[in-house]
């Protein structure tokens, strides 16, 4: 009798433990991936194709530096098979959420892990931190493409050839992109390659394509540009005869407008050269809603305004 009772208790405990286990595969049978920025969402969609369901948290015009997870976001993350984010503190207010997901045994991946530390640009303010805007060098994005393909292939080995083929197609598109933007940038003399923007998002772009880059705000938009920042940048513009400055789709335009006013008040005319996509892509369904389309648009806007 005692032996039967022990077996019954063990059976109950086992049943309860099964009920408590999380079924990581949603009932639609697809492998669900939650991504953060629109750049990553677009990349994973290109590689994962029809074999995965991709849900991005951040849309067009959303600033990842300031983004906070809603209850709905936490629910999406908790029910994901995999989470893919940028890293290097780009999504600074989501770090604790990602750690929580890792404790729940959800595969949580930072695409910045694809890059060697020597390829990263260090922060001038914090010795152990790096510039998180890694997508603005296409070579970085190529490495990240390979990294994401490997992660998907490990998670779904039955589809690894499919992912590999999609990645190869996308890498070829990135190769063409590099050729096109290098050809367009070559039409702009090096002494005119001075890029002034709302915040320090374009350092990788500057390093790759020989631009001197100046941002009103630092690497993160979490801190506002002060009067000294505006005056210092205004002096730079006047000294180097910069023709145009740029606003960003994910950053309020008021700081750049204040900069323009400061420059114009000193008898030097500077125009707003256009809106660049920095921390987010354009609207879905538009060319700028893709990484490749965004990059082409930015380069065309920059070159035309600075010529």
Over which residues does each language-model region extend?
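Extracytoplasmic metal-acquisition and chelation regions
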Residues: 21-307
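Sec-dependent signal peptide recognition
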Residues: 5-12
């Amino acid at each position: 009798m005692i032996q039967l009772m022990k077996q019954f208790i063990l059976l109950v405990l086992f049943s309860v433990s099964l009920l408590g286990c999380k079924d990581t595969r949603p009932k639609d049978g697809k492998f669900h991936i939650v991504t953060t920025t629109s750049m990553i969402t677009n990349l994973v969609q290109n590689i994962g194709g029809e074999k995965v369901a991709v849900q991005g948290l951040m849309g067009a015009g959303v600033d990842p530096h300031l983004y906070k997870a809603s209850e709905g976001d936490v629910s999406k993350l908790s029910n994901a098979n995999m989470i893919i984010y940028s890293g290097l503190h780009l999504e600074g207010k989501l770090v604790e959420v990602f750690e929580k997901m890792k404790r729940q045994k959800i595969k949580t991946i930072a695409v910045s892990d694809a890059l060697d530390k020597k390829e990263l640009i260090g922060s001038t303010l914090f010795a152990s931190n790096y510039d998180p805007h890694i997508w603005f060098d296409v070579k970085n994005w190529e490495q990240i493409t390979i990294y994401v393909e490997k992660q998907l292939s490990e998670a779904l080995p039955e589809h690894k050839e499919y992912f590999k083929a999609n990645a190869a197609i996308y890498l070829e598109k990135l190769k063409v992109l590099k050729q096109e933007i290098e050809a367009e940038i070559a039409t702009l003399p090096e002494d005119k390659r001075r890029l002034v923007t709302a915040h320090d998002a374009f350092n990788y772009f500057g390093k790759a394509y020989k631009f001197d880059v100046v941002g009103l705000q630092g690497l993160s938009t979490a801190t506002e540009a002060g009067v000294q920042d505006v005056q210092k940048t205004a002096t730079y513009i006047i000294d180097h005869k910069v023709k145009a400055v740029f606003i960003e789709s994910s950053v309020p335009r008021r700081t750049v407008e204040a900069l323009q006013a400061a420059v114009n008040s000193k008898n030097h005319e500077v125009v707003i050269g256009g809106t660049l996509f920095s921390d987010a892509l354009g609207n879905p369904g538009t060319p700028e809603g893709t990484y490749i389309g965004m990059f082409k648009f930015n380069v065309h806007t920059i070159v035309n305004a600075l010529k």
